[in-house]
Curated annotation (Swiss-Prot):
Keyword field contains Magnesium: no
Protein name in the entry: Small ribosomal subunit protein bS18B
Role of this protein: Binds as a heterodimer with protein bS6 to the central domain of the 16S rRNA, where it helps stabilize the platform of the 30S subunit.
Gene3D superfamilies attached to this UniProt entry: Ribosomal protein S18
Subunit structure: Part of the 30S ribosomal subunit. Forms a tight heterodimer with protein bS6.
Organism: Mycolicibacterium gilvum (strain PYR-GCK)
Coiled coil: none
Amino acid sequence: MKRARRAAPLPKKRRNMFAQLGIERVDYKDTSTLRQFLSERGKIRSRTVTGLTVQQQRQVTIAVKNAREMALLPYPGQG
């Protein structure tokens, strides 16, 4: 007896976090905004968690790395 196939789940619509926060460009000096994209251990959260587009995730990643370099944000495992 064959099993019934399940219908493929509908993809979730991505919410634009930058539009919700009123951000056009990510700035490494804006640590309060960047902390929203970090875990409690200081790691950068993935796109699936944050709901960002590829380009936005790259901007956040670069900004977080610059902020870490300038000692505005901690490196993972140190905070």
